Regions:
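Glycan-recognition and processing domains
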Residues: 2-31, 38
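Short, aromatic-rich amphipathic segments at membrane interfaces
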Residues: 29-53
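Hydrophobic transmembrane alpha-helices and immediately adjacent juxtamembrane helices
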Residues: 48-338
Length: 338
């Protein structure tokens, strides 16, 4: 153990403790000389070499996967063209889907806004009153938490609905002439109506706490688009597989429950050690949630996070190309298993 030592010389003040040492230069002389340091143990923490090796291997593997995905990108672009050519039909189906979702209830579409709002209030009460969560940096915990849970609501709702879209619209899947590849987009647009309402809610709540609309906050458009792309890419895989493996719907629900806490939404990732933080950041929704907080609270542009941005879009590219390939392979058998 190192006993705390505090001293002062003509040129500097110093303090050596068991956690390190502090040196303050006195005057304008930028040069100091330290001598006669003995019987001192200085603990220097550094990254283990295995960590650098693993990161290098992960980068090479991801680069190889992305390169392979790019080779099939040209064929996959035709898949997107189907949605563009049928945008009018998608808009009409999305409106009907949103209305029909709550058609049998007295309050109708109002439930689409009440359910997320009640959930927000419950989580807010648990974290602020129960766990007594403090402010995160300079941001009040309430606005920090809500700006993170709003995009998660959209992701969770959209992924659940798109994964089951071919089962729900089975009568359209059986029609030979209908382009069923537009159906996941229908569900995403349907979920977007509620999301836009809660984005306005963030603006209003932010103004209450002194976070007024500016150019940074307009980035929600970019991050919303990025989240739509992410859901669409994942849904190509899940909606195709779930027809053959119905248990996938339950598995997705479990993953989303874990994902809420692992993104994380209600607590800050700074509580974790460095290497664990990097593992958590591999979750693409971490990029989205952080992006919303950067837009409304931290005032950080998305291009100021270049590595996270490149990684996110690389994941989307790989998921999209794999999803299109899987969809095309399984599509001829859809009508047989519905």
């Amino acid at each position: 153990d190192i006993e705390e030592k505090v001293g002062e010389s003509e040129d500097l003040e110093y303090a050596i403790t068991d956690t390190g040492f502090d040196i303050n230069v006195i005057g304008s002389n930028p040069y100091i000389e330290i001598e006669n340091i003995s019987n001192q143990i200085i603990d220097v923490t550094s990254k283990p070499m295995i960590y650098d090796v693993l990161m290098m291997l992960c980068s090479l593997v991801l680069g190889f996967i992305v390169a392979n995905a790019l080779t099939g990108l040209k064929k996959s672009i035709k898949f997107i063209k189907a949605s563009i050519d049928n945008k009018g039909l998608i808009k009409s189906l999305a409106k009907n889907d949103f209305k029909n979702k709550y058609a049998s209830s007295y309050l109708g579409i109002v439930w689409g806004f009440i359910n997320p709002l009640i959930t927000i209030l419950v989580y807010w009460f648990v974290f602020t009153v129960g766990f007594r969560s403090s402010d995160v940096g300079d941001a009040p915990y309430t606005i920090w938490f809500i700006s993170g849970i709003i995009p998660w609501f959209f992701f969770s709702d959209a992924l659940n609905s798109t994964s089951n879209v071919f089962l729900e619209y089975s009568y359209l899947v059986k029609k030979v002439v209908f382009k069923i590849e537009i159906l996941p987009t229908v569900k995403i647009i349907s979920a977007l109506f509620v999301h836009l309402f809660f984005v306005i809610f963030i603006y209003v709540l932010g103004a209450v706490y002194g976070y007024y609309p500016d150019l940074y906050s307009l980035q929600f458009i970019y991050y919303s688009f990025a989240m739509i792309v992410l859901v669409f890419c994942i849904s190509l895989i899940t909606s195709s597989v779930i027809l053959f493996f119905r248990d996938l719907g339950q598995i997705i629900g479990i993953i989303l429950n874990i994902g809420f806490w692992a993104t994380p939404i209600g607590w800050t990732i700074d509580m974790l050690p460095g290497i664990v933080q990097r593992i958590f950041k591999l979750n693409p929704m971490y990029y989205i949630v952080t992006g919303y907080r950067d837009s409304f609270i931290n005032k950080v542009y998305f291009w100021e996070r270049p590595y996270e941005t490149i990684y996110f879009w690389a994941v989307c590219l790989v998921a999209f190309c794999f999803g299109v390939k899987l969809f095309k392979k399984l599509k001829p058998h859809f009508s047989d298993v519905i």
